[in-house]
Amino acid sequence: MALIKLLLASLAITSVCGMYSKKDDVVELTEANFQSKVINSDDIWIVEFYAPWCGHCKSLVPEYKKAASALKGVAKVGAVDMTQHQSVGGPYNVQGFPTLKIFGADKKKPTDYNGQRTAQAIADSVLAEAKKAVSARLGGKSSGSSSSGSGSGSGKRGGGGSGNEVVELTDANFEDLVLNSKDIWLVEFFAPWCGHCKSLEPQWKAAASELKGKVRLGALDATVHTVVANKFAIRGFPTIKYFAPGSDVSDAQDYDGGRQSSDIVAWASARAQENMPAPEVFEGINQQVVEDACKEKQLCIFAFLPHILDCQSECRNNYLAMLKEQSEKFKKNLWGWIWVEGAAQPALEESFEVGGFGYPAMTALNFRKNKYAVLKGSFGKDGIHEFLRDLSYGKGRTSSLRGDGFPKIQKTEKWDGKDGALPAEDDIDLSDIDLDKTEL
């Protein structure tokens, strides 16, 4: 059976059973409720981002449940299944599992929990964060985060209303807030007399509240702020446009989703997921680097590049650029990525039955099952893309890793980014050698 089919079967079972049930004090968090339960809440939260196939996540379950029971009534304990709700972890750069984050007084700046994975240690850290929040409130600081620079004013659609997260946009602030922003924006261009705009207003506000901290929603009165409206050739109302981070006027895209808040949230969440950073392609210079990058991932992609003397810096950088491009295209899969120099890790190559003179080469490994697949096509953009696409669809032949489990990674020097150089040869002094001319 193909590697990915086994994985998908496993995921299908775990997604039904779940690592936590409704009987537990651990709250199941999803794309639909994360914003309202965590970000828009005054409660202190600790949230675990996990994958059902992750061994460390399974080991954490009993201690995490115990911590949730102990903190009941004091703080909230939640969990997000990243195989089902990837966009929730995207804004927080979740790369490995389990990842635990504490959402304290400032929900926009959660802190990483890196302590021991025991109920006592988890509870202690959450209580410490709760104490900070209490001190901040006693000192007159707000427990939430305001939408500074939102351009609030007397506009009818955004700004100063209580609980209204829709940003009022104008000719004066549009460029600074939207076009020069690192945030994702959805902007509604409306007219005060437009009936469809009035119908959309409560849905737009609800979506803005749900998406707070992930995607920003704005509204611009196109009958007043005509400079911006004309730039985007607004002719009908409402018109909704999407702006990715760092967009220019020409980069604006039309929104093509539904007009219920749930439709808007789902559409925007998908775009947020697309904008999550691609996983880094690490050089496998030691055991720790490889395990950190791969062990808790569904799959790990290994690239074996030619020796630096056979493929100098420009050549190698071209290969690395190609790998980074593919990691971007397949980032939603949350795979790990490793590259090593050919022949630098003979035990690893032997386990995969690659190497020798066959560089470059690529394999994909499931650490849990010790199953791998090998790229049989060309090591080029199209060949690699086809190989990875087949893996993501559950296609391709797999083999069992040779030997007794994953081999030990030899410690090597990190590549300095420079061309390789042949070792200098020692000059041989022939002056002391007396050769008879007749011997020449």
Swiss-Prot record:
Q: Where in the cell is it found?
A: Endoplasmic reticulum lumen
Entries under PROSITE patterns matching the protein: THIOREDOXIN_1, THIOREDOXIN_2
Give start-end positions of Low complexity composition bias.
139-149
Q: Could you say which residues form the signal peptide?
A: 1-18
Molecular-function annotations in GO: protein disulfide isomerase activity; protein-disulfide reductase activity
Family statement: Belongs to the protein disulfide isomerase family.
Among the GO biological process terms of this entry, one is: response to endoplasmic reticulum stress
Name used for this protein in its record: Protein disulfide-isomerase A6 homolog
Q: Where is this site: Contributes to redox potential value?
A: G55, H56, G195, H196
Q: What does this protein do?
A: May function as a chaperone that inhibits aggregation of misfolded proteins. May negatively regulate the unfolded protein response (UPR) through binding to UPR sensors.
Could you say which residues are annotated as the site Lowers pKa of C-terminal Cys of first active site?
Answer: R117
Name the residue ranges with Gly residues bias: 150-163
Q: In this protein, which residues make up the domain named Thioredoxin?
A: 19-131, 127-273
List where Basic and acidic residues composition bias occurs.
410-419
One GO CC annotation: endoplasmic reticulum lumen
EC numbers: 5.3.4.1
InterPro entries assigned: PDI_thioredoxin-like_dom (IPR005788), Thioredoxin-like_sf (IPR036249), Thioredoxin_CS (IPR017937), Thioredoxin_domain (IPR013766)
For the motif Prevents secretion from ER, give the residue ranges: 437-440
Active site per the UniProt annotation:
C54 (nucleophile), C57 (nucleophile), C194 (nucleophile), C197 (nucleophile)
> For this protein, what reaction is catalysed?
Catalyzes the rearrangement of -S-S- bonds in proteins
Q: Where is this region: Disordered?
A: 138-164, 404-426
**Disulfide bonds, paired cysteine numbers:** C54-C57, C194-C197
